[in-house]
Amino acid sequence: TRCSRDWSSDVCSSDLVFTEILQSGMSDEECFIVHRGKECFVIMNAFPYSSGHILVLPYREVSDVEALTPSEHAELFALVTTGIQVLKTEFKPQGINVGINLGAVAGGSVAQHLHVHVVPRWGGDTNFMVTVAMTKILPEALDVTAARVRARWAQMGGAR
């Protein structure tokens, strides 16, 4: 399983994509993991809506918020909060979306592994190109963005 810069569409379309990434044996840098906690981790979205789009999720595959243990729940939302602070500090967005898509009909593309989207937003960042031509225009490469997020996270006290 590859999870490096050329994110395979086969891997990314897998229902087990996050578990496959964790079990790939590749470095966090190659897999765009920016922080590891005790029960949850933070990874860059391979198909970001905007620069800095992160996903926060438990290591354990669960599909619903109510399936989280109390400690997973606490850490997940603590990491969401830290992620918001990291993105605000590093990218200076005008707003942030935080969301969970529970189930395929709700928009969940990896519905069996709960993950929280934390998306920096700016006025006019409609990303209309995605719907027109399946093209993503971002100001920097994903590995550069991941390095920025990782460094800022460590600087803000979230050492790995």
Regions found by a protein language model. Give the residues of each.
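Long, well-ordered alpha-helical scaffolding segments within enzyme catalytic domains
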Residues: 69-93, 143, 148-152
